[in-house]
């Protein structure tokens, strides 16, 4: 996340170090013509390299909670044991911003927004993060990065004929980061990531119903004061109420909920 969860140039409004900062897109558009990136030449390694560089850019341009911050301490406690999960090497940080979101990238980077942490219990956060890990494991994040690379209209930055992506300028990284966060997963991809998140909770003996309660919280937000923002974020997702019901049905079948 998008996913958690969407063509503009610059990405972030940075209000240095405050919890009132907002992670947002401005309304400028990329003027260059879109150039094709053939799937055959855009590898997993390309996606991971671009993702790492884009996330590094976002980390520099957002208020990241330091190691001694209560948000970081809490996330370490919740998720620290899962940095190596299902063959993936994961890293995580907290952005101290007012938007409610979390996302994962093709290099295994997971970023959680402090406003999401404020509204979720520990196990609900694990459900959200498990969902995001699902997008990485299912290669959804690779496909999103390839699409972002195309939308950012800088495919001529590709290096050799082997398809290895060369170093990018700061403005190019900002454009790719922006396009990456605007990427939307299909409903099928979201449902499959939900299944992965459920199984992540089940495998580690967490309360699987935390995923249902997380969806219900998002559903309540989408009908409240933040309706327009939440509706935009969730527009490509299956209905949150339906997602909660699907979790309940699985839990009943597995004997984990009555």
Question: What is the meaning of each model-derived region?
Answer:
Residues 22-258:
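A Zn2+-metalloprotease active-site environment signal
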Residues 1-8:
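Bacterial N-terminal signal peptides that target proteins for export
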Residues 8-16:
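Bacterial N-terminal signal peptides
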Residues 17-21:
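Sec/Tat signal peptide C-region and signal peptidase I cleavage site
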